[in-house]
Amino acid sequence: MAFDETYNEPESTEVLVKSLDPEHPALLRYAHAGDAGADLITTVDVTLKPFERALVPTGVAIALPAGYVALVHPRSGLAAKQGVTVLNAPGTVDAGYRGEIKVPLINLDPKHTAVFHPGDRIAQLVIQRYVEARFIPAETLPGSDRAERGFGSTGVAS
């Protein structure tokens, strides 16, 4: 089968976005076609000393359709180059939440202070469908190959 670019075209859904900061209208947008994450920016100056954390406002609130969740992910470049990441990655924004999306950032670099200014990209927002589970109480669970073997049970190398 020949590669067809439309084959990988993602499905889309509408997400309502409200800008909360008139000085920094923060509309969500994707940096490149095909990106999974839309950039979230800061609307304030933020200085993070080594091992310091802050809850950073983004200036946006969203309304997701039922059956969707927004996940706040770190930006790989910030983590790799500055040691800054999202503390609770991925952060969960439920469909019913209408408040401002805020990002808990932490500077894990032991020596350097990280500085952000309004408009700087600080995280990515990924929209995903989800399945709501029906949790059923059970006295026993069916067997599996893994059973109760947990952390480290598969080894460290193949």
Curated annotation (Swiss-Prot):
Cofactor(s), names only, from the UniProt record: Mg(2+)
Q: Which superkingdom heads the taxonomic lineage of this protein's source?
A: Bacteria
Q: Which UniProt keywords apply?
A: Hydrolase, Magnesium, Metal-binding, Nucleotide metabolism
User: Which pairs of Cys residues are joined through disulfide bonds in the record?
Assistant: none
Sequence positions that bind substrate:
R75, S76, G77, N88, T92, V93, D94, K102
For the protein in the UniProt heading, the enzyme class is hydrolase
Instruction: Indicate yes or no for the key word Oxidoreductase.
Output: no
Which named protein is this? Deoxyuridine 5'-triphosphate nucleotidohydrolase
Name the species this protein comes from: Bifidobacterium longum subsp. infantis (strain ATCC 15697 / DSM 20088 / JCM 1222 / NCTC 11817 / S12)
What is the phylogenetic placement of the source species in the record? Bacteria, Bacillati, Actinomycetota, Actinomycetes, Bifidobacteriales
